[in-house]
Amino acid sequence: MYAVFQSGGKQHRVAPGHTVRLEKLEVATGSTVEFDQVLLIADGEKVHVGAPLVAGGKVVAEVVSHGRGEKVTIVKFRRRKHHDKKMGHRQWFTEVKITAINA
């Protein structure tokens, strides 16, 4: 059984027991989160595709941790002008473990 749900403007394909990194959620570590923007649920031969969402579909997850991702380096450079600018960015994330998928 697997599902595709939407969180933080991105779509994630998950199954029970999977651990996923999502955009930062303002929830405490150890708490339970429910995602109701489910786009698809597949259970063996049966596939429920939403238009755009599956009615009554829900993905339940437990918050494992919060953190920051790998550093991304941004370099801006102007040729012949002796000008360059270097910046870095680390995106916040929330790591969740999928506990249940309800159709």
Curated annotation (Swiss-Prot):
A molecular-function term among this protein's GO annotations: structural constituent of ribosome
* InterPro entries according to UniProt: bL21-like, bL21-like_sf, Ribosomal_bL21, Ribosomal_bL21_CS
Give an example GO biological process.
Answer: translation
User: Which Pfam families did the record assign?
Assistant: Ribosomal_L21p
Quaternary assembly: Part of the 50S ribosomal subunit. Contacts protein L20.
| Main function | This protein binds to 23S rRNA in the presence of protein L20.
**What name appears for this protein in its UniProt entry?**
Large ribosomal subunit protein bL21
Q: Which gene encodes it?
A: rplU
